[in-house]
Amino acid sequence: VIVRLESSGGMVHAYGLAAAQLARIKEAGLHLTVCIDKVAASGGYMMACVADKILAAPFAVVGSIGVVAQVPNFHDLLEKHDIDVEVFTAGKYKRTVTVFGENTEEDKQKFQQELEETHKLFKDFVRKYRPNLDVEQVATGEHWYGEDAITRNLVDALQTSDSYILEKMTNSELYAIQSRQKPTIAQKLGISQAAQAVVATAIDKLPDALAKLESAKMPMVKK
């Protein structure tokens, strides 16, 4: 099985599930090759590392084994305008850092601890599927291009997916499987297509409208 993978990452639980689904392919006894033509970073690499073989284009972005969270805080702004936000929880750490309330040092430390624990799980996952990889060396959140990624054992070879597939076509029968996103309600009703048609028609008529407007301009005379 060959999987073309392109992802810069996202939520941990979503990519953990996606990686588990790829692992099922291997559990079924099938050889899994992941091809990275553009990017497989963070959660994307979490998915890629499951493969028996990882191929990357020379300038594909690979790595970013780390965890990041950004939380804006409006407490000072709200306090300036005499606005209080009440947060009610059951359980000491049900809510650590918050957007509207005041974040204490204990809250921040707990949140940082959770990030570190998630990072450890990420590293352990990569280590499980890439035992020859020096995980501590590459689990800094940095990313590398394919040329450098191969020297760090993040990938196994430099090759584009097209090149690899064409190579396999010489002695194998290939079947392309494409997923289709569930259509939205607007697409089902044809609303989105109608809107696109209106926009396209308006764009087509724009040059004529501008020409008429230009010809209708009256010369200006200074008194």
Which residues does each PLM region occupy?
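Short glycine/proline-centered loop/turn elements that form peptide/ligand docking sites
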Residues: 61
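N-terminal organellar transit peptides
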Residues: 1-47, 51-57, 65-223
